[in-house]
């Protein structure tokens, strides 16, 4: 659930009293994280407001389309969609936080709130960052050519015997803990047989199978943005995919698995149906880029939970 305190929605405004308070479910399927951390190519809306002179504060938890203290809804979440963070998810203090925010910005009462981002990792740990995604991420590129493709390289089309047409790619395990924090990129070469086609990618822990995040793209929008670039049947293009915001700790010894289908979650299948499969190229030039951070625990936030 997203909550705003804002007097001007244009991030280009640089003068006057402007502020934004964001309460966001990192597993929200309605107001999804990309509406907060996405934007046009090269833009992260959350950071764009900060850079434009807004006072911005965020509480970013692993709940779905719920309020931070909506316990009954939190109890119904599934694995890979917030369950692993459930024991430390509920924020009983969020309404008090909101009250103090508006007391200061609407009435001038009380101290100025800290302009930070409180982010919950997928295993439940809360911490305080200056912004999110953090500014100090280090990008780690993984060539899909170094990963294992389990046979198929077509997304969509007529179902194969025994199930739907999907592509499964498993990448090597990491030799140390890996903390993903931000918008994972997948720049993948692909070819269409039709003026259309769609790829939905679910990222999983290769050992446990737990969902980490997802991305989806219509190949006609392969360059990103809101307007279709279009595609010529048989043409190879680079699908510049970006995952919904992820804050996840992948333990040493585990790797990443990518499962590619035509649709997933609540996204609609392509209108062209089985007539528009997409050939994905699991090769060296297709790159998965992970934004990684290293934290020592000094910015961990302890939150009260029910007994």
Regions found by a protein language model. Give the residues of each.
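Catalytic histidine-centered segment of alpha/beta-hydrolase-like enzymes
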Residues: 65-87
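Conserved alpha/beta-hydrolase "acid-adjacent" motif
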Residues: 29-43
